[in-house]
Amino acid sequence: MTAQLIDGNALAKTIRAEVAGRTAALKAKGVEPALSIILVGSDPASQVYTKHKVNDSTETGLAATLETYPADMSEAALLDRIRALNDDPKVHGILVQLPLPRHMDSQKVIETISPAKDVDGFHVASAGALMTGAPGFWPCTPYGCMKMLESIGYDLRGKHAVVIGRSNIVGKPMAMMLLARSATVTICHSATQDLAAFTRQADVIVAAVGKRNILTAGMVKPGAVVIDVGMNRKEDGKLAGDVDFDGVKEVAGWITPVPGGVGPMTRAMLLVNTLEAAERAAK
């Protein structure tokens, strides 16, 4: 068996086209969806990520601005800037690129963003909404994973899903989203004993720990769906996920590649969240 590929690039392209159409409709009503991105410091990876986010936005008709500040910017100044954006009716989404400089409290910064503009889905109010099923913004990476499962017509009801990783950004919200679709969910992490004992029982596996080859072919049930959230650098500098792709693809039924899998979907769902923030504000 060779697994079928879930092409994140192709799916993200479809979603961007949908966003462009809805954005045009909103503009026709006099509302221009707008995203403000804040970058503090000069981390090379963050510079690349924010550039992609601006380009994605403008390509779909969303207005996007990137504000860059030096790494020695005070936390108080950053919070003041966020509050000003909260009060600006022309701004619908606010994204502070992580990681922040060490002298800043990331959670405090995130909590300063208005929940109505928290398009990253990291605010505690967004987490609470996800937990209870109330309206809110889902974190972009697990949201993208769910869209990938939807794209292959996968029915999660009654299926056993194993999430490897327990971060607030991916692991925990991923588990909640799967649970909301009536999957039976197991969360594994660094203290889990005998990881393979859990993954071999799984119909769906989401690997999200940032560790190469944490999931190998012998740990996967034949026909399982494998979603690889990992983003790691190999010795030659090329990107690799958390999954041993070459081995696992011979066992799994469906698998996402790295690159070209979850990454493009994360960016696409940011556009969806920003558009929905604008649509809600326009009501």
Swiss-Prot record:
Belongs to the tetrahydrofolate dehydrogenase/cyclohydrolase family. It comes from Variovorax paradoxus (strain S110). Pathway: One-carbon metabolism; tetrahydrofolate interconversion. It catalyses: (6R)-5,10-methylene-5,6,7,8-tetrahydrofolate + NADP(+) = (6R)-5,10-methenyltetrahydrofolate + NADPH; (6R)-5,10-methenyltetrahydrofolate + H2O = (6R)-10-formyltetrahydrofolate + H(+). GO terms for cellular component: cytosol. Homodimer. It comes from the Bacteria. The gene is folD. Keywords: Amino-acid biosynthesis, Histidine biosynthesis, Hydrolase, Methionine biosynthesis, Multifunctional enzyme, NADP, One-carbon metabolism, Oxidoreductase, Purine biosynthesis. One of its GO terms (molecular function) is methylenetetrahydrofolate dehydrogenase (NADP+) activity. NADP(+) binds at residues 165-167, 190. This is Bifunctional protein FolD.
